[in-house]
Design a protein with these regions (language model features):
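Charge-rich, low-complexity N-terminal segments
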Residues: 1-106
């Protein structure tokens, strides 16, 4: 079970990461829906899940590369908004849970 502080951190990142993405110039990622954040090792690492149902496999790879390039900008926006001294290292992954649930419904 996760500690309450870790859950708060994840919840805060769920709000701040889409705000940071919306300020970027890349049209593929500035309105990307973030579906979840999973913090590991305290606040040192965070896996950020996004909904890529609108993209094919090649476009998902491009989106992940764009997110990797924008990682520093996202981290600086999160740091400015929170006042933390350290921001987690973000790893972006496609959320496959939505696709699995659609298959179950069909």
């Amino acid at each position: 079970m996760k500690s309450i502080n870790l859950q708060r951190t994840e919840s805060l990142l769920m709000e701040l990461i889409p705000q940071a993405l919306s300020q970027l110039q890349n049209s593929k990622i500035n309105s990307l829906p973030i579906t979840g954040v999973n913090c590991k090792n305290g606040k040192y690492d965070a896996i950020v899940y996004f909904d890529g149902s609108d993209f094919d496999k090649d476009e998902v790879k491009e989106v992940i590369e764009s997110l990797k390039k924008a990682n520093g900008r996202i981290k600086s926006d999160v740091l400015a908004s929170t006042g933390w001294y350290k921001c987690p290292n973000f790893k972006f992954e496609l959320d496959t849970y939505l696709e699995k649930s659609k298959k179950i419904e069909d």
